[in-house]
């Protein structure tokens, strides 16, 4: 892995990340393909939209279809016919989401498979083994996602466990030529975030992610922790904000020096008939669009906006036609990729602050 910073505008950074399967221009947004597919879209469509890297999920791919299937194809890239870089989450957040169905110990996490009820045991070593089979360009350490809200002692215990798991992840990753990213935890406590960063830095990683945000905390709390944490991450390594977020969240995070993002919002909201546009969010189920013959966004040149009207998309949403979800997803991911392109251009021109002010209205 090679990360090169080209320029910056205050804290906002413009760079290039070179990985085994290609190059990524940063700041970058990664569409989420949890099960090895971005819902409803083909790899060719994703490339046409401008996506350079996508995210897969270790936990879900391990359970279904299973490693033997992916290994038979020679890795996740061939299995899903995507020849660009792939980042895989370690499974820590998904285990956290199981709630009472899982039992955490020093060794790892024991839980019942949500697929068939089998007892499963996921450890840092097993997560690294799975991601090696997947041949992920960016491997994430196995960590515990600190819940919200929790008191400081619980958050500290969780952060310390994640640091011990980070050491084990690093040791188990040895011999894998792909990149390994550490994940900063510590809940809503700045001092714990500081100690997490110091511990991860001492272990040494190819990049650093901020985890444990967008887990139910108020927006102002997320911004407080982000603005405290991001500037402390190593300058010469890529910085990844996990699971965030809205277009506004992304612009604010770029202001803090974040380079990489992922979020399910553009595709999930597309399936629910919410489109991101230059004029704000358009909610297609609203009856006001039944006779609206204008495109979803007058300022967008995506396939959906060039060929279809709001009235047609309203009709598809109301009737539950799967084409509606596809067309909406094409538009929303195009919107996100164009946003990242505009952000990169603004940083290059030294105009990012002005861009951010215009964007926030």
From Swiss-Prot:
Q: Determine if Amino-acid biosynthesis is one of this entry's keywords.
A: no
Q: Where is this region: RNA binding?
A: 243-249, 267-271
List of residues binding substrate = 89-93, 143, 185, 212
What is the UniProt remark on how the cofactor binds and its stoichiometry?
Binds 1 zinc ion per subunit.
- InterPro entries in the cross-refs: ArchSynthase1/Queuine_TRR, TGT, TGT-like_sf, tRNA_ribo_trans-like
Swiss-Prot/TrEMBL keywords? Glycosyltransferase, Metal-binding, Queuosine biosynthesis, Transferase, tRNA processing, Zinc
Q: Which reaction does it catalyse?
A: 7-aminomethyl-7-carbaguanine + guanosine(34) in tRNA = 7-aminomethyl-7-carbaguanosine(34) in tRNA + guanine
Protein name stated in the entry: Queuine tRNA-ribosyltransferase
Species name: Nitrosomonas eutropha (strain DSM 101675 / C91 / Nm57)
Please name the gene that encodes this protein.
tgt
């Amino acid at each position: 892995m090679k990360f090169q910073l080209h320029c910056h505008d205050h804290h906002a950074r413009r760079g290039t990340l070179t990985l085994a399967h290609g190059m990524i221009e940063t700041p970058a947004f990664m569409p989420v393909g949890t099960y090895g597919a971005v819902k409803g879209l083909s790899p060719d469509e994703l490339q046409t939209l401008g996506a350079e890297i996508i995210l897969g999920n270790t936990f879900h791919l391990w359970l279904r279809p299973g490693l033997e299937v992916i290994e038979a194809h020679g890795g996740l890239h061939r299995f899903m016919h995507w020849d660009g870089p792939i980042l895989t989450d370690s499974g820590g957040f998904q285990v956290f989401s199981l709630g009472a169905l899982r039992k955490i110990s020093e060794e790892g996490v024991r839980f019942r498979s949500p697929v068939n009820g089998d007892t499963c045991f996921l450890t840092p070593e097993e997560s690294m083994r799975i991601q090696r089979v997947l041949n992920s360009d960016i491997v994430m350490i196995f960590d515990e996602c600190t819940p919200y809200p929790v008191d400081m002692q619980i958050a500290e215990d969780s952060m310390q466990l994640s640091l011990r798991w980070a050491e084990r992840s690093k040791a188990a990753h040895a011999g894998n030529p792909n990149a390994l990213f550490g994940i900063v935890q510590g809940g809503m406590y700045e001092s714990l975030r500081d100690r997490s960063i110091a511990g991860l830095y001492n272990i040494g990683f190819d990049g650093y992610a901020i985890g444990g945000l967008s887990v139910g905390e108020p927006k102002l709390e997320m911004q407080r922790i982000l603005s405290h944490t991001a500037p402390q991450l190593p300058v010469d390594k890529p910085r990844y904000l996990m699971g965030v977020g809205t277009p506004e969240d992304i612009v604010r995070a770029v202001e803090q020096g974040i380079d990489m993002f992922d979020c399910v919002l553009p595709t999930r909201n597309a399936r629910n008939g919410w489109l991101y546009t230059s004029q704000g969010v358009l909610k297609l189920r609203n009856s006001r669009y039944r006779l609206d013959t204008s495109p979803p966004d007058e300022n967008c040149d995506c396939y959906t906006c060039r060929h279809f009207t709001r009235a047609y998309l309203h009709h598809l949403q109301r009737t539950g036609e799967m084409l509606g979800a596809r067309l909406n997803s094409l538009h929303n991911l195009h919107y996100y990729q164009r946003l990242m392109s505009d952000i990169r251009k603004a940083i290059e021109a030294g105009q990012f602050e002005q861009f951010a002010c215009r964007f926030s209205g």
